[in-house]
A protein has these predicted regions:
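Extended catalytic core of nucleotide-activated donor transferases of GT-like folds
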Residues: 1-59
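Short acidic alpha-helix that forms the nucleotide-activated donor recognition element
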Residues: 4-8, 148-160, 181
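Acidic donor-binding loop of glycosyltransferase active sites
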Residues: 11-14, 154-171, 184-185
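A short, active-site helix/loop in glycosyltransferases that binds the activated sugar's phosphate group
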Residues: 42-68, 74-78, 133
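Conserved catalytic-core segment of nucleotide-activated headgroup transferases in glycan assembly
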Residues: 64, 70-138, 142-149
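Short alpha-helical segment that forms part of, or immediately flanks, the ligand-binding pocket
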Residues: 153, 176-181, 195-196
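Nucleotide-sugar-dependent
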Residues: 164-175, 188-198
């Protein structure tokens, strides 16, 4: 009712709603509502004037391409600077980074593997933005989340690659797209359910790890190199 009231008061032709995709009260009965679905849903949940998925992967896997898709626009600040000096990270150190929801780095064996590497290799740093702290080590750095786009770009500029450790995976994967757009390789767990974040990437853009041993091998053999062209 509130949506109808404000929509008519503002003389709107359309209302855009970004949500999980399920049927709920966030739809107008009087004004054409455009639904941008972010998560997997059954076809019976489709509603609104127009209903689109957030990624090609989501449309293909959960609607058999019956629904169109509209991905996010990935746009980052143009700054070339980074956070290494402020964080006392040396130029020759390899930096693996990740940013996302605070509980999104939740695969326990990945956490333990990173800690094991940090204890043995002084030339490797793990850098997290907005991720809940899961261990204490001087070369595993946790930064508070931010809405500052310049700071976020500086964070990505500080990293040589992204280490992805979310057990569910992504129906889009904005953080992964931001890293990839800057030529950063993605290391992602092989046995996750949702794989939109690597769906359209070529093999040079990502590698999947399947176990602790496999992840150790991939990270220990990673070499600093020029970023690939996306």
């Amino acid at each position: 009712k509130d949506m109808d009231h404000f929509g008519q008061k503002l003389n709107l032709d359309y209302i855009y709603v970004q949500k999980g995709g399920e049927r709920d009260h966030n739809v107008s009965n009087r004004i054409k509502t455009l639904i941008h679905s972010l998560y997997p849903q059954n076809l019976k949940e489709i509603h609104g004037h127009k209903y689109v998925c957030v990624s090609e992967w989501l449309s293909k896997k959960f609607t058999n391409n019956k629904m169109p898709f509209l991905p996010y626009i990935v746009k980052l600040n143009k700054t070339k600077t980074n956070l290494k000096k402020n964080l006392q990270i040396k130029k020759n150190q390899i930096v693996f980074g990740c940013h996302g929801g605070e509980n999104s780095f939740d695969i326990e064996f990945v956490r333990q593997t990173l800690l094991e590497i940090a204890k043995k290799r002084k030339d490797v740093v793990f850098l997290f933005l907005n991720i809940k702290k899961f261990c204490k080590h001087p070369r595993i750095i946790f930064l508070k989340g931010t809405f500052n786009e310049i700071y976020k770009k500086k964070f990505i500029n500080s990293c040589d690659a992204m280490i992805y450790g979310r057990s569910l995976g992504e129906s889009f994967g904005l953080a992964c797209a931001e890293f990839t757009s800057q030529g950063k390789k993605i290391f992602s767990y092989k046995f996750i359910k949702h794989k939109s974040h690597i769906y359209n990437l070529s093999k040079k853009n990502f590698e999947e790890y399947s176990s602790r041993k496999n992840l150790l091998n991939l990270l220990n053999n990673f070499k600093k190199e020029k970023s690939f062209n996306f």
